[in-house]
Amino acid sequence: MKTLFQIRPARFSDIPAMQCLFRETVLAVNRQHYTAEEVADWASWGDVRRQWEGWFARQHYFVAESPEAGMTGFASIDETGYMHALFVHREWQRCGVASALYETVERFAREAGAGRITSEVSETARGFFERQGFRVDGKQRQQANRLWLKNYKMSKRLDCPELDVK
């Protein structure tokens, strides 16, 4: 059982490993809800390093890493509570990595004074986010590179969660 990992703030030097993890995860894990053409288009969205550098300028990134496996996942959030990313390596799915990363970004959002966390969530990740207390605010189509993919606008209130009626 894979359980040994730690969470730390990401560094610019992590970008190549994050790009690789992103691509491999999308191609392997998201095939259950998206076509091969859709996942290929989505995976290519993270190929440009300059784009990642821009995301780093606007978001706070955290990585999960294991002594034996290296990077096992990453997540990002900004001060307003917008969570741009949460990806876990395909071999570390259902090992607690996503939950630990989510707890880290939620703690960051609370400390930043955000009243809610919002995200655009894939069909594949929707169940995980619902288990964290998120609700679907709407269904949408989001452009990856060439293609428009189905996903969900989701949110979780941090200030008064009891008001978040499903």
Place the predicted regions along the sequence by residue.
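Exposed loop/turn and edge beta-strand positions of beta-sandwich/beta-sheet ligand-binding modules
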Residues: 58, 82, 115, 148-150
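Short secondary-structure capping/turn micro-motifs that flank functional sites
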Residues: 125-126, 145
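Conserved G/P- and acidic residue-centered "switch" motifs that form tight phosphate/ATP-binding loops
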Residues: 96
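Conserved catalytic-core motifs of GNAT/GCN5-like acyltransferases
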Residues: 118-120, 135-153
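Acetyl-CoA-dependent GNAT
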Residues: 9-12, 20-93, 102-104, 108, ...
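Conserved active-site tyrosine of GNAT-family acetyltransferases
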Residues: 129-130, 134
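Conserved GNAT acetyl-CoA-binding A-motif
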Residues: 109-121
